[in-house]
Design a protein with these regions (language model features):
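A short, conserved alpha-helix within the catalytic core of class I
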Residues: 139-150
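Class I SAM-dependent methyltransferase SAM/SAH-binding core
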Residues: 71, 76-119
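C-terminal alpha-helical "lid/dimerization" subdomain adjacent to the S-adenosyl-L-methionine
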Residues: 164-208
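Class I SAM-dependent methyltransferase Rossmann-like catalytic core
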Residues: 21-46, 51
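N-terminal, positively charged/glycine-rich alpha-helical extensions of SAM-dependent methyltransferases
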Residues: 1-29
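Class I SAM-dependent methyltransferase "Motif I" SAM/SAH-binding loop
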Residues: 66-70
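A conserved beta-strand element that flanks and buttresses the S-adenosyl-L-methionine
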Residues: 131
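Conserved beta-strand signature within the Rossmann-like core of class I S-adenosyl-L-methionine
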Residues: 155-164
């Protein structure tokens, strides 16, 4: 399954539309747990805070593409203060958006939209920062380039991608230790596929060339994560 020199994009169980709601929620809950334990949320927060630190209270809209149950936006809402910052989660899955709305009830700055992001009219809907966490590895290279081009159209300030590092060491760690801290079979199964479908730094550079970007920044994090920051204001 794991191939060092190329991504192995096998379907994950959680991508199957026939996966029952309870099983899917188990997978989402495990992803949220891993993000909290291994700093996934914090890495995105740090990147966004750096991007907006000189914004001087100007309105900022942050979009989370492939938001799932909205856990990332709830985390950002908790740690980024000010009514001038608004959060919008976009997901193609109706049940994910329904779950996100239920879990985010009472958060006035957070809202969600069920939509295919590729079909959004950017003349009437845009944002300042677009972020996406553990979503990109679900797609093949040509699909990723298509998404990134759309993201560039939407985001006036920057794109922040948070995703996995394709590493034999990470694959081995997860294979042997995930039964200890992950209860659900779907998460153990999909976790290995996710690592095999993840990225090396050279992959991001190929995508950058494909979308005409040369000022991006790729940051490696200790938990086998990459934060990929793509400024979009210098076009």
């Amino acid at each position: 399954m794991y191939k060092s020199q190329q991504r192995n994009c096998q379907p994950e169980w959680m991508d199957d539309p026939d996966t029952d709601t309870v099983t899917l929620q188990h997978a989402v809950d495990d992803i949220t747990k891993i993000n909290r334990l291994l700093g996934g949320f914090k890495f995105t927060l740090q990147a966004i805070k750096k991007l907006i630190k000189n914004n001087a209270g100007k309105p900022v809209t942050i979009v989370d593409a492939g938001c799932g149950d909205g856990a990332m936006l709830r985390y950002l809402d908790q740690h980024i203060q000010g009514d001038h910052v608004q959060f919008i989660g976009i997901d193609l899955s109706a049940r994910s958006v329904k779950c996100a709305r239920e879990k985010s009830e009472g958060l006035s700055r957070v809202r969600f939209r069920e939509s295919d992001i590729l079909n959004i009219d950017t003349s009437i809907f845009s944002c300042d920062i677009l972020t996406s966490t553990l979503t990109m590895h679900h797609f093949k290279d040509e699909q990723i380039v298509t998404f990134l081009r759309k993201f560039k159209e939407m985001a006036s300030m920057a794109i922040v991608i948070n995703d996995l590092h394709r590493s034999r060491l990470a694959y081995g760690f997860f294979k042997y230790f995930s039964p200890i801290f992950i209860r659900h079979e779907i998460s153990r199964h999909d976790g290995l596929i996710s690592i095999a479908a993840a990225f090396k730094k050279a992959d991001f550079k190929r995508y950058s060339l494909a979308i005409g970007v040369n000022n991006d920044l790729v940051i490696w994090k200790w938990s086998f994560r990459y934060i990929w920051i793509i400024p979009t204001h210098e076009r």
